[in-house]
Amino acid sequence: MRSWLTVIGLAVAVWISIVAHTSEAARPAAPNLRALQGVNFIGSCTFSHMAMDDPIVYPGQPGVSHDHSFVGNTTTNAFSTLRTLRAGSTTCKRNGETAAYWMPTLLLNGQMVAPRSATIYYRRKTLAPLKAFPAGFKMIAGDRHATTPQGMQITYWNCGAASTVPASSAVPTCPNDRGQSLRLHVNFPSCWDGQRLDTADHVSHMAYAVRGACPADHPVAVPAISLIFRYAITGGSGVTLSSGGQYSAHADFFNAWRQGTLVSLVGRCLNALRHCGRDS
């Protein structure tokens, strides 16, 4: 009898070991910083319109702001709300991307130049899983008052990834080649305080992740947005921004996505550690 109990006990122990090993193998590996490289989904949008409006900084005050170039939602103006934006159409290719994005308008020798197109990367920068931006969320990245170079982790100019011209805080002179025309990049923070949809300064509810982690006072990881405007010009010293000089780059984001679409993309692309790109 005792030998049978011993055999049964050994069998149970082996079974528990197999189950534990199988469960461990089936569990997705915890991500590391290297695993986050290339995890994204991408928006492709064309230019919509220009206006001296800013529904985040100057809501309900048309004509008060410096001039902005808008992509995404086609109805964005000083009076925009979540409801009006949700009712609008979009210049973005993906159905449901009715969010509003804007930057200061580029000037070439004093003449306004519209962006040819915009690419919006939604990336994962944190080891912790992400939450989608809540509906109506607003934020600004970059400093519209800057008169000296901002950190290039926030904003920079370049001539495209394939160009040999290095990225810089000042406007470069790009080759006279459509594939290497001037670009302006602005990178948004990806850590939220988890409470406020906006703040008086439009920035303090957000923080940048450091080595894959959010700070304790901004504990909620959200997608890291990179907004890139492409211009059909080569750049050079004649380029300025409507907010002043070459260093005052900044960008605004107003979340008016169809929320179900955004939540789905965050879940099946960013939290699943997939490179969805534009085809998602």
Regions picked out by a protein language model, each given a short descriptive name:
Residues 1-4:
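Positively charged n-region of N-terminal signal peptides that target proteins for export
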